[in-house]
């Protein structure tokens, strides 16, 4: 039996099935979430704050909701984008000029994100073209946000219950190792 603290449903039927493809028709999407804290991201007087996002991925779309879109997703540039380890690629991207032709590559990697993002995974699997602002897809964006919000509320996610600040003000507990 599952522990009372655990949520969700068993994935075992999919693992032991002799068929391939979608085994359970109810499993037609995935919910993802992230609360990433970084010593290089601030928000006013708050230090080491989260970059919270939640997403819903179905057969066609990836919908992302960035709850604090005014924050830098990879950490503040003035602190060295600390949520991205040093590498030749990071060095190359951070040395690009502010010329619009080059700036887009920096922004795709380190720039601020809009509140909502939508990618067509069948036609743009690399998630390069954000379609959230396309008026022709406004109904799709609204439908996906409603589905995501409904499921997050059912799970008790503080970000959709108006209690998201709990992630930014909660005390951080550190392990102490005795010699």
Language-model regions, residue ranges each:
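C-terminal cap/loop subdomain of S1 sulfatases and analogous C-terminal strand-loop tails that border
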Residues: 1-117
């Amino acid at each position: 039996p599952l522990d009372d603290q655990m949520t969700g449903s068993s994935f075992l039927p999919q693992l032991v099935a002799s068929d391939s493809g979608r085994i359970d028709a109810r499993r037609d999407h995935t919910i993802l979430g992230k609360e990433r804290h970084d010593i290089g991201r601030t928000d006013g007087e708050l230090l080491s704050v989260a970059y919270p996002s939640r997403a819903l991925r179905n057969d066609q779309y990836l919908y992302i909701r960035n709850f604090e879109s005014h924050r830098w997703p990879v950490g503040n540039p003035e602190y060295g984008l600390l949520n991205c380890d040093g590498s030749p690629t990071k060095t190359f991207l951070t040395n690009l000029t502010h010329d619009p032709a080059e700036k887009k590559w920096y922004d795709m990697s380190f720039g601020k994100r809009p509140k909502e993002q939508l990618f067509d995974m069948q036609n743009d699997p690399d998630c390069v073209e954000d379609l959230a602002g396309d008026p022709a897809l406004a109904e799709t964006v609204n439908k996906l946000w409603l589905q995501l919000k409904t499921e997050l509320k059912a799970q008790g996610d503080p970000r959709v219950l108006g209690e998201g600040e709990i992630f930014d003000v909660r005390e951080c507990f550190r392990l102490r190792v005795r010699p």
